[in-house]
Amino acid sequence: LRQQADKPKGQPNFSLADFVAPKESGRVDYVGGFACTAGPEVHDLARHFEEKHDDYSALIVKALGDRFAEAFAERLHKWARDQWEFGLTENLTSEEIIREKYRGIRPAPGYPACPDHTEKWELFKLLDATNHTGISLTESLAMFPASSVSGLYFAHPEAKYFAVGKLDRDQIHDYATRKNMEPTEAERWLRPYLNYDPDSVLTKPCLPGAKVESMV
């Protein structure tokens, strides 16, 4: 998916694909994947407090669980950078790590740079994530346990976070074709990002010979 908003001259419309060497370049490049969790114990302990009507303690447990999962993801990212070797020369303070001053990014499906939650299906398949971590995906593609993180590692020195923003019908249909998915299915998962109303007859593509009458 690529940004489609009009930008000032000289400013590119980003896609995460920009940070991976194209196949035709002949260059060897890699993208990493990860999935980690603070474990089911976070859910169980929070449930324990909820059953005792101690909502405050339940909230604290969930918040700590989320922080542990994010810290785990941060540690895994450091390990990945070390495997790529450029991380071995890092000498960052805790504040610089929090501000993500290192090289590379780790976007997650469902977030602004990669808004399609269905990418988790392929990621979990490649990692065999459920067997290795115990993390499962719900029907809405949320992760369970909730204190879990998954995503991709990009090593490109100019990789940056961005928001894809609103998407037009042409890109949605092209994207659906490349994912071997029905356009209506892609629209369902990406609905918050659509720059059109998929239910409106005025925005639906017409078949040859079809007529659209104005309702104004």
Predicted regions, residues:
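Generic structural signal for hydrophobic core residues of well-folded globular domains
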Residues: T37-A38, F72, K179
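Compositionally biased, low-complexity/repeat regions
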Residues: K78-T177, P183-T184, R188-R191, L202
